[in-house]
A protein has these predicted regions:
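Short, Lys/Arg-enriched N-terminal segments with co-localized hydrophobic residues
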Residues: 3-8
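Beta1/beta-strand and adjacent pyrophosphate-binding region of the FAD-binding site
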Residues: 20-34
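Short, mixed charged/polar active-site loops
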Residues: 23, 97-100, 160-167
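Glycine-rich FAD pyrophosphate-binding loop
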Residues: 29, 42-63
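N-terminal Rossmann-fold NAD(P) dinucleotide-binding loop
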Residues: 37
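Predominantly flavin-linked oxidoreductase catalytic cores and closely associated redox partners
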Residues: 43, 123-191
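A conserved beta-strand/loop capping segment in the N-terminal third of enzymes
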Residues: 70-126, 133-134, 140, 145
Length: 191
């Protein structure tokens, strides 16, 4: 195992030394605990894969929370998470022209994202995923390039600040951290 020396500056590769230190190891690290990340972590954990679900926590996404019936069935979403069932939609133009859009399969379920996302994260944890609240910082690799190290900041619950750095080792990383994914920006620079 390797230890990162110092902090990371933008566009600067971290340096390594050979000092041994204990770093938790996971087969997969999932960055982002929204529906995609939480369900990926759950599926992997159910298959016996050691997985860390890393999520910032403490925020609500600006999303309508619409879930089609097929997804409700396939992802085994309990009825009590549905806050409404919508059976039609309407588009209104700036000139007030209206177009009704029928909803196939009878309805679209609406969920409160705060409750829904937390339900999925808890379900992933109950199925074996390790869940940590923290902010993803960066990815680095050892000199051989065969170990991926994921660096993140853990939230200090007493002071409610992201204060101390942590590092885990993994074989694979899933960037489920949204449209402006920091994981993707680092791994695919011109994306």
């Amino acid at each position: 195992m390797y230890k990162l020396e110092g902090g990371r500056m933008k566009n600067q590769k971290p340096t390594w030394n050979s000092q041994k230190t204990h770093i938790e190891k996971f087969d997969v690290v999932v960055v982002g605990g929204g529906p995609a990340g939480a369900t990926a972590a759950e599926a992997l954990a159910k298959d016996g894969v050691s997985v860390l679900l890393l999520d910032k926590g403490g925020r609500i996404k600006p999303c309508g929370g619409a879930i089609p019936p097929k997804a409700i069935e396939e992802f085994n979403i309990p009825e009590e998470l549905l806050v409404a069932k919508i059976n039609k939609a309407q588009i209104v133009s700036p000139k007030r022209n209206k177009v009704d859009i029928p909803i196939e399969n009878g309805f679209v379920g609406m969920v409160d994202r705060e409750n829904f996302d937390e339900y999925l994260r808890v379900r992933a944890e109950k199925n074996g995923a390790v869940r940590k609240i923290g902010a993803f910082n960066f990815i680095s690799r050892n000199k051989k390039g065969n170990n991926i190290l994921v660096h993140y900041s853990v939230r200090n619950k007493i002071e409610d600040t992201e204060s101390f750095p942590e590092t885990v080792m993994t074989k694979f990383i899933i960037g489920a951290d949204g449209a402006n994914s920091e994981v993707v920006k680092q791994e695919i620079p011109d994306s």
